């Protein structure tokens, strides 16, 4: 698994939680799993998380070079998962092993929300170009909408694996007095 962040990265979010759950499932089925991610201050260069070998090397702009070098020194892998989040690892260009692209969302207009011009325009352009370059690489996503956007960009093979939901119901919901008016806030990213 090539992902810019791993579960212990201070900037890790939902994508890393979902990825960890999928990879944990592979380990439980007897597979050997390695997760290559960016290094971060205070992060060990290597550790095991839930049976997954996590390697951290390189930074925001150099991790893909470190991954490429590290991969070239390894025996072949059965599968390399190139996780996209804005910018992929371009593994099909340097990895002779079978590659799958894993994507949670096509960023598209999200570039505008996080980056000023011209970075937003460059990001959108790069993403469209990248998806065309990856058109023959099998993609894996969970969302119908992402599948539709990938299809519009010319991606030929898309496997949709819905997100699993692990919930534990409250055994008891304590009574509590609520003041009127009731207000609710939801925060997400």
State what each model feature region is.
Residues 4-18:
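A short, glycine/small-residue-rich beta-strand->loop->alpha-helix junction that serves as a flexible
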Residues 5-9, 25-61:
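N-terminal strand-loop element at the rim of the active site
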Residues 56, 70-89, 100:
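Short N-terminal targeting/anchoring amphipathic segment
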Residues 79-81, 94-112, 119-120, 140:
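Active-site proximal beta-strand in glycosyltransferases
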Residues 118-140, 148:
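Membrane-proximal helix-turn-helix segments that form the acceptor-binding/catalytic region
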Residues 140, 176-189:
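Conserved donor-binding/catalytic core segment of Leloir-type glycosyltransferases
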Residues 145, 161-164:
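Carbohydrate-associated surface elements
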Residues 151-156, 164-181:
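Acidic anion/phosphate-binding donor-loop and adjacent secondary structure
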